[in-house]
Design a protein with these regions (language model features):
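A membrane-periplasm/extracellular boundary helix in multi-pass inner-membrane enzymes
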Residues: 89, 94, 149-153, 171-214, ...
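Hydrophobic alpha-helical transmembrane segments
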Residues: 288-299
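Transmembrane signal-anchor hairpin modules in multi-pass inner-membrane enzymes, especially those
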Residues: 1-29, 39-40, 44, 64-74, ...
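Membrane helix-loop boundary segments at the extracytoplasmic
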Residues: 278, 282-287, 319-361
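Central hydrophobic cores of alpha-helical transmembrane segments in multi-pass inner-membrane proteins
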Residues: 1-7, 53-58, 284
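Alpha-helical transmembrane segments of multi-pass inner-membrane proteins
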Residues: 24-32, 50-55, 68-99, 105-173, ...
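Membrane-interface micro-motifs in multi-pass membrane enzymes
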Residues: 44-48, 106-117, 279, 284-288, ...
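Long extracytoplasmic/lumenal interhelical loops at the membrane interface
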Residues: 100-104, 209-224, 232, 236-287, ...
Length: 371
């Protein structure tokens, strides 16, 4: 539709464009010089990432007004949060017996789904703030609460930790801190007492994860191998999903026990290679130290530009833009924290958020009243 648009808005190249495209270019370089045994798979994953970059570009080209942004956010919420809400209802009706996972595809893993839900909750709260219809506002609050339940229902420890930190960040920004703190103090013991036993047992393993939890130990192995790959290939890394290459995994497996600050038992020879399960180690293994630097610069620039949009909106009295910029900052914080537990460095929702930040900045929506 953009190509047949008669009056195309003028394109503005921003600092976020620079960092996103530089990251895309560096992933191309790392793919060209990938060290996987099956290089075709690295190219397959790069082609998938190109589609994500295309999504970012088209958002910055076509999303120009508050109406465009709200429509796009509604699409995200109805597609992601509504699914999480339905799964939360099943979790409640089953007395906690229903284990929530995503649909087949990129968010099928429960940890990945928990990250996405954490990122979407601030967007639900934004829609609540700009919605005037009373019943719709009630529905959005209900949806936000169901999304909280959905994170619990994934049994994801990282997702739950991210939820706690997100809730704390939202509380810090609220105008009724004492009231919400009082409600939380009363509600948390009751909710915990009625939580499923299996859920409480899983959350209790956080303290002993490094020595007793096989899932977490597997992550430590993957993080060590990711670092070893980057140390041997500091500029370009090993290419997409380098840690999942069986030959590379076995090549570095013997070096893992005493490598790094945490001792881990030797990797069993029969163990299947593990994904990085951490966005930072994922990029480090895939694109080297320079790639990780660009990735961190991209996320940092997005966060601080959104904060700048928030400040400019507040100064101009544009409440919706201020609230949205604040919500996006919270979503990025949720991603940065829960990303410690998942391999979602190339997640579409992140680049969609970056596109919205660009739309607000490039079109100066922070100073334009709603028509």
């Amino acid at each position: 539709s953009y190509f047949v648009w008669k009056e195309k808005p003028k394109f503005k190249f921003t600092s976020i464009h620079f960092w996103v495209l530089l990251f895309g270019f560096w992933m191309l370089v790392s793919t060209i010089f990938n060290i996987r045994v099956s290089s075709d798979y690295a190219w397959f994953k790069y082609n998938e990432f190109v589609k994500v970059l295309a999504l970012f570009i088209f958002i910055t080209l076509t999303v120009k007004t508050k109406r465009d942004i709200d429509t796009f956010i509604w699409a995200i919420v109805l597609g992601l949060s509504a699914y999480a809400g339905m799964e939360a209802v099943k979790f409640i009706l089953s007395g906690g017996g229903h284990r929530i996972v995503g649909r087949s595809g990129i968010l099928q893993d429960r940890n990945d789904l928990a990250v996405a839900i954490n990122m979407a909750i601030p967007l639900i709260l934004y829609l609540w703030s700009v919605t005037k219809h009373k019943h719709l506002k009630i529905g959005l609050i209900g949806l936000a609460l169901l999304n909280v339940v959905a994170i619990v229902g994934t049994y994801s420890r990282g997702g739950f930790i991210g939820l706690v930190i997100l809730a704390f960040a939202i509380w810090l920004k609220s105008n009724r801190k004492l009231l919400f703190a009082f409600i939380a103090i009363l509600a948390m013991p009751i909710l915990y007492a009625n939580a499923p036993t299996e859920w409480k047992e899983r959350q209790a393993t956080v303290e002993t994860a490094s020595t007793e939890d096989g899932s977490f130990i597997g992550r430590l192995w993957a993080w060590k191998i990711a670092t070893l790959i980057a140390l041997d290939n500091p500029i370009t890394g090993g290419g997409f999903k380098a840690t999942t290459d069986a030959v590379l995994w076995r090549m570095y497996a013997n070096e893992t026990p005493d490598f790094g600050p945490i001792y881990t038992k030797p990797i069993p020879p029969e163990l299947t290679p593990k994904a990085a399960h951490n966005i930072y180690f994922q990029v480090l293994a895939s694109a080297g130290f320079f790639g990780l630097f660009v990735f961190l610069c991209m996320l940092s620039k997005a966060y601080f530009l959104s904060q700048k949009n928030k400040s400019r909106s507040k100064k101009a009295g544009i409440k919706w833009s201020q609230t949205l910029s604040d919500a996006i900052c919270l979503s990025l914080v949720a991603y940065g924290i829960t990303g410690l537990n998942v391999s979602l460095a190339y997640f579409e929702l992140v680049y969609a958020m970056l596109g919205i930040i660009v739309a607000i900045d490039a079109n100066k929506l922070y100073e334009k009243p709603v028509e």
